Amino acid sequence: MRNVILLTIDSLRRDVLGSYGGGFTPFLDSIQNRCIQFNQAYSTGPYTQAAFTGILTSSYYLEHGKQKMLSWERVLISEVLEKAGITTTGFHSNPYISTYLGWNRGWDVFYDSMGDEVGEKTPYIKAKEINRKVDAWLSSHVQAGTCKPFFLWVHYMDLHEPYIPDRKYINIVDPSLQMTEDEMFRLFKDVLLKRDVSDRGRVEVLRKLYCAHVREIDDALKDFFGILEKRNVLKESWVILTTDHGDEFGEHGGLSHDGKMYSELVHVPLMIYEPTKEQREMCNVLVSTIDIPPTIVYLFGLRPVHHFQGHSLLPLSDYPVRGVFGEAMDKQGSHENGEEKEIHYYRERDFKIIYRERDDSWELYNLKVDPKEINNIIEGSPQAEAMKQNLRPRIRRYQK
């Protein structure tokens, strides 16, 4: 393989994909025989900034303090590849990982849509337009059916709130759901923005609109793979597909993706597409999105990068058995007192521990018997102290 493509889909819940038990991704399901599927993959954080430090720099969000700008102490995968002479190209429409915040380092081409007009209701460029830009770039990069090895990162925003999908995708999910764009936007403002889960019926409508977007994204993925085939590069490319985080629909009393560390936000889909593969391979080992940059380095045949804290996912036989971490700022209540507090999680085998600085509290869950994280067993659990010891060194470490 000559090329590596990283496809990230904002706010993609694991449980909506057909290969993970959902039912809204027929195209993605159709290519599973060419994929390695990671069933125990975890994000380094529950929202964009906390997650993409793992995905693109193989580091953790709070290592260099509560910085909005990308620290110069972090090394982007694009910087590593650029130095190795590999063409680096990125297309996305998310302001939290924009040029303004320093995420454009090391890219030969970096499109973040910040100079373009976006819709009043939907404040991002949609996947079909991102695909057009990718196609235009490939048409110039690929000459006479060949091209210089490249790393391409594409990030879709269509799953992100405010959840205003096209009518045809709503009909696939629930044809009885008749709403205008204005009604969908009003639901977003009245329910989602206010994090109001008191009316389960309205929350369920939000979930259906979200699932309609999932079906829309699946069509965008089909178009994207079609572009790769048309430009004669798919047969020479690895494709890594994942998300930054999921979205909540009332599972733990909220909506969207605030500073929480429950599975609906941080247990994420992750798969690697290999065009010559003939049978799907499943990996049930605990892995992290922090492992993505080292994996890309491995696929290009480069030397490991000592700045990266993850481990290459490939070959699977060499991946170490270890726990996974995540960290972020807990944004709940910050609008009231202007102060954000740390929140951390650590998972090891079947147990997951969460620490909230806001109220100095701990939660512990046995995911084997309690996958929805309802029964906090921190009091009296024989695993509690050992799990705390694994997490304590990370708490407020940037202040030390």
Predicted regions, residues:
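Catalytic domains that recognize anionic headgroups
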Residues: M1-K400
